[in-house]
Curated annotation (Swiss-Prot):
Name under which the protein is recorded: Putative pyruvate decarboxylase C3G9.11c
Cofactor descriptive note: Binds 1 Mg(2+) per subunit. Binds 1 thiamine pyrophosphate per subunit.
Organism the protein comes from: Schizosaccharomyces pombe (strain 972 / ATCC 24843)
Subcellular location: Cytoplasm; Nucleus
Oligomeric and partner information: Homotetramer.
Residues noted as binding thiamine diphosphate in the record, renumbered to the chain: 396, 419-421, 452-453, 478-483
Family: Belongs to the TPP enzyme family.
Biological processes, Gene Ontology terms: aromatic amino acid family catabolic process to alcohol via Ehrlich pathway; fermentation
SUPFAM superfamilies to which the protein is assigned, alphabetical: DHS-like NAD/FAD-binding domain, Thiamin diphosphate-binding fold (THDP-binding)
Recorded superkingdom: Eukaryota
GO molecular function, one term: magnesium ion binding
Binding locations of Mg(2+): 451, 478, 480
Length: 570
């Protein structure tokens, strides 16, 4: 690398490595091939290209890699490649996931003369796909000059990190080989959260302390943006200091320590388990940290606590009852609040927590030993270990996992807001890759996916095998799209799938030389498997086919489906 100048592509990849990205995801295409050659020029053997089976799966993988590592990058090609990935980036945008989408586009000469090239719409508009992506990105940039490239790249990466949303970078096929100033690379990018206005922050702390002092039964609700904006420790410190009963939303699962003595369950508005609901809704002051109040995350907007008894902590504002304090970030506010409270006084008013984890219930209305959701999920929870990373699929798995209380340090990856079926398979690959690239590479990666969703994105198991990764894949075989059946069309043909797949040979079919597959029909078979030390080591890729009744479903899914069906008819 020159001490003064560096190739634009080399600059870009060096910056990505400095941010902690070690695997560049994507699919090669003629407009990005020359750029991909520059990955090796970074000069770090841990930094590498890791291809995907298709662009949509790649976007899903980038989403989950970012959840594990903090940020990710994926390279696609102009038009046909980038459009295939857009669904995945829409999910990352809505769920607040920082992904850098790099698109190889026609060279700068073609951009100026606009010939009738392949992968275009045939109308000479070479920016149309960039405009599409601009609606799903926090920012977009087009590199057509070496002079400005470094600045544009750095600004784009800062936006990606600060907003925790995808960004889009168009790189003409010749622009990766333009030269740009190398000197900024001497200073790694660091994006600390700006300090709050001290005067306003002091006012906010005082007002919150006053409301806590006046309350008789305060509680805390932890949501998705605690994880998205990396304030897990600040949130846990606040919980430990106050002893307030603490609930999580579906999107807030594993954002805090669920083995904490102050953890009191999952709150989903009207869909909450009745005993938890009664306790949660008896509060006279609800402190919501990192809220993201979507329909499936809130029981279709059925929170019972009024705004007059609510304080909301967000990444860029704080809301106290009806008053909004712009620019007061929870990242800095929570530690100030924790330091300011009178622990003895505050802890004295904290209601004792008497949380009991869900218990496995044997099958009702089915043959003895049949695996049902009431039994499976609490039983699955007993299999988990500290620091496991569990990816759950949209639909059955996302709702069933709510009955699992996670050990300390676990991470549950889900896509509750966007809800694209098939997401979890690509996400599993990205998560497992992220674990490998992390400071804790020995964590287990576990996927739970239904057979219907698996059929959409199964190809990414091939990439998982090709890269020597060893996740445990649970396939719930219940012969179709259960969540759709419950919403509409219980016995409709459009909710059926091909039920003749041979899951037991799936891993071998994708070329796995070392793998294990299990065909589980009964409670005893699954319990025996969970006791198997070899299985628990997760030293080879494994697939567990779990057979469940067609119309059996988790309680929360059944109730949510009723709400959704009713809403769809309005």
């Amino acid at each position: 690398m020159s001490s003064e100048k560096v190739l634009v592509g080399e600059y870009l990849f060096t910056r990505l490595l400095q941010l902690g990205i070690k695997s560049i995801l994507g699919v090669p295409g003629d407009f990005n091939l020359a750029l991909l050659d520059l990955i090796e020029k970074v000069g770090d053997e841990t930094f590498r290209w890791v291809g995907n089976e298709n662009e949509l799966n790649g976007a899903y993988a980038a989403d989950a890699y970012a959840r594990v590592k903090g940020i990710s990058a994926i390279v696609t090609t102009f038009g046909v490649g980038e459009l295939s990935a857009l669904n995945g980036f829409a999910g990352a945008y809505s769920e607040r996931i920082p992904v850098v989408h790099i698109v190889g586009v026609p060279n700068t000469k073609a951009q100026a003369t606009r010939p009738l090239l392949h992968h275009t719409l045939g109308n000479g508009d070479f920016k149309v796909f960039q405009r599409m992506s601009s609606e799903l990105s926090a920012d977009v940039a087009f590199l057509d000059s070496g002079d400005s490239a470094g600045r544009l790249i750095d600004n784009l990466l800062e936006t990606c990190v600060r907003t925790s949303r995808p960004v889009y970078l168009a790189v003409p096929s010749d622009a990766g080989y333009f030269y740009t100033d190398a000197s900024p690379l001497k200073t790694p990018l660091v994006f600390p959260v700006p300090e709050n206005n001290k005067e306003i922050e002091h006012e906010v702390v005082s007002e919150i302390l006053e409301l806590i002092e006046k309350s008789k039964n305060p509680s805390i609700l932890v949501d998705a943006c605690v994880s998205r904006f990396h304030i897990q420790q600040e949130t846990q410190d606040f919980i430990d200091a106050t002893h307030f009963p603490t609930y999580v939303t579906p999107m807030g699962k594993t954002a805090i320590n669920e083995s904490s003595p102050y953890f009191d369950g999952v709150y989903i508005g009207s869909l909450t388990e009745p005993s938890i609901k009664e306790r949660a809704e008896s509060t006279d002051l609800l402190l919501i940290i990192g809220g993201l109040r979507s329909d499936f995350n809130s029981g279709t907007f059925t929170y019972a606590t009024p705004a007059s008894q609510t304080i909301e902590f967000h990444s860029d504002y704080t809301k106290i009852r009806s008053g909004v304090y712009e620019g007061i970030s929870m990242k800095h506010l929570l530690p100030k609040l924790t330091a300011a409270i009178d622990k003895k006084s505050v802890q004295a008013k904290a209601r004792p927590v008497h949380f009991e984890p869900p218990k496995a219930v044997a099958a009702e209305g089915y043959a003895e030993g049949t695996i049902t959701h009431k039994w499976f999920w609490p039983t699955f929870a007993s299999f988990l270990r500290e620091s496991d990373v569990v990816t759950t699929e949209t639909g059955t798995s996302n709702f069933g996992i709510l009955d699992c209380i996670f050990p300390k340090g676990c991470q549950n990856l889900s896509q509750v807001l966007w809800g694209s079926i098939g997401w979890s398979v690509g996400a599993m690959f990205g998560a497992t890759l992220g674990i490998k690239d992390s400071d804790a590479p020995h964590r287990r990666s576990i996927l739970i996916v239904g057979d219907g969703s698996l059929h959409l994105t199964v190809q990414e198991i091939s990439a998982t095998i090709r890269n020597g990764l060893t996740p445990i894949i649970f396939v719930i075989n219940n012969k179709g799209y259960t969540i759709e059946r419950l919403i509409h069309g219980l016995h409709a043909v459009y909710n059926d799938i091909n039920t003749e797949w041979d899951y037991q040979n799936l891993l071998k079919g994708y070329g796995a030389k070392n793998s294990r597959s299990y065909n589980i029909h009964s409670e005893k078979e699954l319990l025996d498997l969970f006791k198997d030390e070899e299985f628990g080591k997760a030293d080879v890729i494994q697939l567990v086919e779990v057979h469940m009744p067609v119309l059996d479903a988790p309680r929360v899914l059944i109730e949510q489906a009723k709400l959704t069906a009713s809403l769809n008819k309005q």
